[in-house]
Amino acid sequence: PHELKQSRADIPEIARTLGEILGKDPIWIEEQAADIKRRYKQVGTRIDEETAGKIRDYINEKGISGIHLEPTSQRVYPYETLAAQVVGFTNASNEGCEGVEAAYNSFLAGSTGRVITTKGNNEMDMPFSYENYVSSRQGDSVILTLDATVQACLEKQLSAAIARYDVQNGAFGLVMNCKTGEILAMATLGSYDPNKYLEIADTDTAAQLEEMKRVYLAQPEGSEAYEAGKTAYGEALSAARLKQWRNRVISDGYEPGSTFKVLTMSAALDCGAIDLNTPFHCSGSEQIPGRAQRLHCWRSTGHGAEKTPQALQNSCNIAFAHIALKLGGERFYEYVKNFGVLEKTGIDLAGESKGVFFDKALVTDTDKWGTASLTSGSFGQTFKITPLQLVRAIASVVNGGQLLEPYIVSEILDADGNTVMKAEPTVVRRTVSKETSDTMRTLIESVVTEGTAKNAKVAGFSIGGKTGTSEKIDVFDENGQRVQDKIVSFVGIAPMDDPEYIILAALDTPSRETGIYISGGVMAAPTVGAVMADVLPYLGVKQSFSEDDIAGKQIAMEDLTGMTAKDAQSLLKKEGLTAAISGSGETVTGQIPSPGQTVPGGSQVLLFFGQTPEPETVKVPDFYGMNRQQASDAAGALGLYILVTGNDEISTGVTVTAQNAPKDTEVPAGTTITLVFADTAA
């Protein structure tokens, strides 16, 4: 400011020009320029090179003295939106905000070098003064447990589910190592770009904000309408930013729904309240002792006679209400406490909450309060926990009974590469016995093979899991009526013989307009299945195919040209393939599929003798809604193969819900199209 005044610069004109270039209020810039008591005033930070160039041109054109550009450093996020809520960002002052940036700011920041010297009353250096130099310290490097490939796969499948089911309020999910507590992926969608953290990433929200801004700017400045509109715009902008920065996996509680049944059944088996042969009967609804209203199962016609395994496979609310009564309020509450539901997980991220559970008396004093809280709580309703709390608890059920402290930072290195901190798995406490854990692994796997989660199947992998569908009981419409919005979820575990990875996917408010039945089994289970199909091979989990699921095995075609018919057929047979022969001759002269293409196990390969097939491309049909037979016929007519993923039952109700190649994509004949099958009926 002092330099500008001495140069007799046209400060109002400078303020207008800089305001236009920087997108800032010219009046505010003029106020900064008028503060001549300060040596300098900062009016812009983190400006890009294009903007800096415009300012340089303006300075040179006008010959202005008193405007300076200083090079600075800033954090660059090359992965952009990937894991944005986990990583966080640094603000204009290079301070860590949100996520890892906030939690580990003291390690990442380092310290700035400085010179301590004497100044005159105009903040200018004095002659013959002393100077003391303090060296800078580089910040440490923080190494995350996140795997970029796994994170990208999780976000890709959540995004696909949002589009497929017209999900209204985003999605969240995570991938954790069951044995260590390491977080391999953690996602909240919609996301944002930490490089542009102040920009609203959601286009609809951004458009609404722009309209609010346009409306208030159209009012006379200083008028009541102008000021009210400006305030409302500022509040809405702030709320939108906070929403997109929020990590729902650790910060937001939600009703877990039927995924919580894993914990209830584990507790009841562990203390002997039930065994595998305990009988139940579900008629669709029942007047449970201690409840004012009849309890309804999700299946209105009921499940009939069941034993413990079927109660979990069918996700039967009536059976679980009786399990809760057998367990009793005291034991139920103590197991819930042991599972970590009443406490934060301790993850090394800023902003973790612990959800909201019942007051102990509501569960234990059933003489006074009835059994509504106890029985509803047994199947995950009328309380809230965070997604991470749930995943940590279920991981303990399948890993032998050890409740782990999840972590996101594996190691911290100083500027010289020396280890400052190295994370190790931390066991908090035991939740259930190893014997109970072994039993539960078998039961959880049966939910995928025989129960409500068949849509999560991935050929060649042993997968277990539990579906969940919960109502958002605290959401109301403009008339104060409770809406029927739902969160659908699925927790999947693999491989079940020795669990390593646990994956949660949750979709917040799928639209009814799609006509697809809204449930965790229909929507979230195939989403997790798709994540597993992507990441399990990458993580080194080996596939093992039985004769029943050989069609799910992908076989890379070898080059059979030059082989005799006998040798080619013998090689194909070893791979679980058959051959059809076209033409005559001693050796193979061509083949469909071509060498290097993949085909499902059990497929037929076309071998040419004495002729070479002309290269041919075909358009991929729209398989959506077809059952297995229809899809097979449509593919076969075009010389295509199909790889079945998801629900492998052959039924008219099990249909294609997704395909890896869009309709009308041109592909070579012999290409394998991956189809996701799911039972979308209620």
What spans do the regions from the language model cover?
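Acidic/histidine-enriched alpha-helical segments
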Residues: I27-R38, Q74, V167-T180, H281-S285, ...
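Short, glycine-anchored, charge-dense loop/turn motifs used at functional sites
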Residues: P1, L154, M176-L184
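Ligand-recognition elements built from short beta-strands and adjacent flexible loops
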Residues: A423, G460, G464, D474, ...
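Solvent-exposed, polar/charged alpha-helical surfaces in well-ordered, non-transmembrane soluble domains
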Residues: A9-R16, E20, I27, T45, ...
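Second-shell loop/turn segments in exported
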Residues: P1-R8, A15-L18, K37-R46, V87-N91, ...
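Small/polar-residue-rich segments within soluble enzyme cores
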Residues: L4-A9, E13-I21, I27-G139, Q481-R482, ...
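Beta-lactam-recognizing serine transpeptidase/beta-lactamase-like catalytic domain environment
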Residues: G120-Y133, A171, K179-S258, L263-L507, ...
